[in-house]
Amino acid sequence: MNKWDKRFMELTCQVATWSSCFRAGRQIGAIIVKDNRILTTGYNGAPQGVESCRDKGECMRDKLGIPSGTRHELCYAVHAEQNAILQAARLGISLKGATLYCTHQPCVICAKMIINSGITRIVYKEGYPDEFSMQLLNQAGVQVDAYDNL
């Protein structure tokens, strides 16, 4: 592992603490980097102007008994990877050739956004039970590295 991967993953874990997700263990962070410079950050949380689950004091998914990794549409939060990509779009920043550092392996919805954004490498810390996302990323030529294997 090189010093930059270590530094950016440490920062990604710090960004995850900004999450407004109420669900235990679901604080996710993401940083998009190019040429060893941070372009954007993202964490999972409610869209701008929408009350977060943390502020409400409950998780809609827990209340409805929805297991992690399913029915993503039934959640107030925007995923960390999505927020980082959306910030780049909002600011007019190209992500072509960038690296995404994230605390968790991206889901299939995020994988599709990552592919189309031009990100060419992902470094993730925690695995996620979504083989389809990995298939898509591999097929699209996105390099995916588990942090512990670097």
Indicate where each model-derived feature is located.
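Zinc-dependent deaminase catalytic domain
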Residues: 1-150
